[in-house]
From Swiss-Prot:
InterPro entries linked: ArgE/DapE_CS, Bact_exopeptidase_dim_dom, Peptidase_M20, Peptidase_M20_dimer, Peptidase_M20A
Annotated binding of Zn(2+) 2, by residue: D156
Organism, as annotated: Aspergillus oryzae (strain ATCC 42149 / RIB 40)
Name of the protein: Probable carboxypeptidase AO090003000058
Binding site for Zn(2+) 1: D156, E189
Alphabetized CDD domains for the sequence: M20_ArgE_DapE-like_fungal
Length: 430
């Protein structure tokens, strides 16, 4: 198994040699990721004194909105090459990619051993770019851990990326032969094309080379026992245009679609035995969000078309079961009008709730409602037992996509300890 996998890796090493711009250093370099103590003159002084916090600053300062991840990917790849990691830049293509803009996942491992523990997060962010900045809390008597770091990606998910890398360096300092693999993917915020590219490649062999996968997302330092599933679709209505002064000469697509939207909007609150979407003790109710409606051309024209984008967070069941429920709801609400229907082919999203492992002591346990790359990574079975999957990271999802995205130094430092604990637990299962 290992020899075959090593051969696969060797064939992919088009960019695996050390980068000449960085001096070589041992894998086990001290990270100084532990909390600072004492007073400080400025927040910048604290960041500059810590290789870990400086690295986090550097990657947050690089704009990497989805489809524009190239520069931050190169920075991370160079950083890891300079620490003697073998680095593979795995090309990822997409329809939104501009000419000469290369996108790639960063896959890195520290030795010739087959990586058995995969540590992964994403390097893309949502728009718009928000510059890196620092703020201090004057009420905390110069406690460096309370310094607040703001900027796009400071939480989601460059906080996880930085903490994962430095946790891995901490582990490798004590155990240079630890079989770790680092994977930082593009496109998580726009459908997961980066993780799917890795999942479908020879870097994710069957049976799985990995007995443990550690995903990084903002979980407020809790270990996540699972997250809801996802289903995306459109509700479409077709009418006939006419002058608004003579509406009886046309058919309003908006009037036709409203009963369907009203019914679908309530499916998460309707019991399953009465035609609603299922709930579960673990995840609560399935939730429905009608996020966008596009209809008509002008107020004085009877609208000929209407379309609504819908996102469902599934608390139970499968996407196929949910599709059947939605179709029935639309049909019942419109008395079977064939010009109003649910369209699923235009949306690729669809996966059931994702249950995750929480068998490592010392963490709070929670569930989350947001989606991740967890379902985009196909887990191949192993002969020695199931592959464990963990989801953990610093920061709160409640600020992750907002203009107030921020994280404290203390949370970042605690995340390094948390990731290290998860890695060390995985090493004991070898």
């Amino acid at each position: 198994m290992k020899s075959i996998y090593s051969l696969v890796l060797c064939t992919a090493l088009t960019a695996a040699s050390p980068h000449p711009a960085f001096p070589q250093s041992p894998l086990g370099v001290p990270t100084t990721s532990s909390p600072s103590t004492g007073t400080f003159n400025s927040a910048e002084e604290v960041i500059n004194a810590s290789p870990f916090l400086s690295f986090h600053r550097d990657i947050v300062q690089i704009e990497s909105i989805s489809s524009n991840e190239h520069n931050v990917g190169e920075f991370i790849a160079d950083f890891l090459r300079a620490r003697n990691f073998t680095v593979i830049e795995q090309a990822v293509t997409s329809s939104s990619q501009t000419e000469n803009q290369e996108r790639f996942n960063v896959f890195a491992y520290p030795s010739s051993n087959t990586p058995e523990i995969l540590i992964t997060s994403h390097i893309d962010t949502v728009p718009p770019f928000i510059p890196y900045s620092l703020d201090t809390d004057s009420t905390t008597d110069n406690d460096p851990s309370t310094i607040r770091i703001s900027g796009r990606g400071s939480v989601d998910a460059k906080g996880s990326v930085a903490a994962q890398i430095f946790a891995a360096l901490d582990v490798l300092e004590q155990n240079p032969s630890a079989p770790l693999g680092l994977l930082f993917v593009v496109g998580e915020e726009t459908g997961g094309d980066g993780m799917r590219a890795f999942s479908e490649s020879s870097l994710n062999p069957a049976p799985s080379a990995f007995h443990t996968v550690i995903f990084g997302e903002p979980t407020e330092l809790a270990l996540v026992s699972g997250h809801k599933g996802m289903l995306g679709f459109e509700i479409v209505a077709k009418g006939h245009a006419a002058h608004s002064g003579y509406p009886w000469l046309g058919r309003s697509a908006i009037s036709a679609v409203l009963p369907a939207l009203s019914r679908v909007d309530q499916l998460g609150n309707i019991p399953a035995d009465k035609g609603g979407l299922p709930s579960s003790p673990k995840y609560g109710n399935t939730t429905v969000n009608i996020g966008r409606v596009d209809a008509g051309v002008a107020a004085n024209v009877v609208p000929a078309t209407a379309r609504a984008d819908v996102a469902v967070r599934l608390a139970a069941g499968t996407p196929d079961e949910a599709r059947d429920i939605v179709r029935r709801a639309v049909r019942d609400a419109t008395d079977g009008n064939p010009d109003v229907y649910a369209e699923f082919n235009t949306r690729s999203e669809g996966y059931p709730p994702q249950d995750l492992d929480t068998d490592v002591d010392g963490f709070d346990i929670t569930t989350v409602n947001y989606g991740t790359d967890v379902p985009n990574l196909q887990i191949h079975e192993r002969e020695d037992g199931p592959v464990r999957r963990y989801l953990y990271g610093p920061g709160s999802i409640h600020v992750a996509h907002g203009d107030n995205e921020a994280i404290t130094v203390g949370d970042l430092q605690e995340a390094v300890r948390g990731y290290r604990k998860l890695i060390e637990a995985a090493l004991q299962r070898r």
